[in-house]
Amino acid sequence: MEILIIKDKIQPKQRPRFWKGKVFTPSQTKSSEKRIAQEYKRQCKTFFTGKVEMGIRLYVGVKNKKQWGEPCLSHFDCDNTLKTICDSLNNVAYTDDSQVYKISAQKIYAPFYYTIIKIK
């Protein structure tokens, strides 16, 4: 099992953009994917070859202390953020995100943005 900690907000996956007949990924999404891949290489060593299971906790930074630890029902879509995480780990933690057969995710209020990703 590997545990990856990202100490920043992860950009949810954005729709592809079209310009002059070409398709491209927005720069915010690309930079977020690159940062996650770099952090995985720095913090973790395992390359998974079989089935992959992921547990993800997305901590959303808010100033109100009363909300800390509570489920977050606003801000960004959880599924788009999961897509960014899974895509960024292609050829880094596993060959392709099609190997991921089970994902559990939580979005929780916290004092600052960070993400904990468990992969097994």
Describe each region flagged by the PLM:
Residues 1-120:
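Acidic, proline/glycine-enriched N-terminal capping motif
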